[in-house]
């Protein structure tokens, strides 16, 4: 019994230490959140963003992903970000505050995108968690479905999509829908993602619709 207690305690300590490592590293590098490391890991494996690209970042606040994206896209690139929460300005990022689920906010976002198609759609969106899977999972799936809808509206042929998805009810159906829209779809679990989290990232390339 005592051995099991020590193991559980050790696991909790390791998780907290692991989290602290990324939080401290983010602070040291001037990154706004530990989530920035997730996009960096996806970029290292899948080379999603290249100089000169146009990127849409959904669920952007506090700005960790936008910081990474604007650096990768460079001076000739463009990053358009949206979140229901406020976000301090980032040089090179066009930020729209509003609820992405509302039609008027979606229209405003599409206006900022303009007539030209975008190269990459990013979504790190997640609902406010209630602790009830029966409530949280449908909310989370609704958000990722909206992100895929955004791809259908703005993504250029052969464009890319990276989206956070929580494994659970609706995941398999969503994976099927993403595979129908893209040539290649990979499931990633970044090292910087909390081990206890059900979140994974779908990285889809070669938009074909």
Curated annotation (Swiss-Prot):
Residues binding S-adenosyl-L-methionine: 63, 65, 83, 99, 124
Active site residues according to the UniProt entry: 164
Compartment list: Cytoplasm
EC number: 2.1.1.166
Entry's Gene Ontology molecular function annotations: rRNA (uridine-2'-O-)-methyltransferase activity
Enzyme class: transferase
Cysteines engaged in disulfide bonds, as pairs: none
GO cellular component, one term: cytoplasm
Alphabetical keyword list: Cytoplasm, Methyltransferase, rRNA processing, S-adenosyl-L-methionine, Transferase
Catalytic reaction list: uridine(2552) in 23S rRNA + S-adenosyl-L-methionine = 2'-O-methyluridine(2552) in 23S rRNA + S-adenosyl-L-homocysteine + H(+)
Main localization category: cytoplasm
Family in the record: Belongs to the class I-like SAM-binding methyltransferase superfamily. RNA methyltransferase RlmE family.
Function: Specifically methylates the uridine in position 2552 of 23S rRNA at the 2'-O position of the ribose in the fully assembled 50S ribosomal subunit.
Full protein name: Ribosomal RNA large subunit methyltransferase E
Organism, scientific name: Shewanella sp. (strain MR-7)
């Amino acid at each position: 019994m005592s051995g099991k207690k020590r193991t559980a305690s050790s696991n909790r300590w390791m998780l907290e230490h692991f989290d602290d490592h990324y939080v401290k590293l983010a602070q040291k590098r001037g990154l706004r959140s530990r989530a920035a490391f997730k996009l960096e890991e996806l970029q290292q494996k899948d080379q999603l963003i290249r100089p000169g690209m146009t990127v849409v970042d959904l669920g952007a606040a506090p700005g960790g992903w936008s910081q990474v994206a604007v650096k990768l896209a460079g001076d000739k690139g463009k990053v358009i970000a949206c979140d229901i929460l406020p976000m301090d300005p980032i040089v090179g990022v066009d930020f729209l505050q509003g609820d992405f689920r509302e039609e008027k906010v979606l229209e405003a976002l599409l206006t900022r995108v303009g007539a030209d198609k975008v190269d990459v759609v990013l979504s790190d969106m997640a609902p406010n968690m209630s602790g009830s899977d029966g409530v949280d999972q449908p909310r989370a799936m609704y958000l990722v479905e909206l992100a895929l809808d955004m791809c259908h509206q703005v993504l250029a042929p052969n464009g890319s999509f990276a989206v956070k998805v929580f494994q659970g009810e609706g995941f398999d159906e969503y994976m099927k829908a993403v595979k129908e829209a893209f040539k290649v779809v990979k499931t990633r679990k970044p090292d910087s993602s909390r081990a206890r989290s059900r979140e994974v990232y779908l990285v889809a390339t070669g938009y074909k619709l």
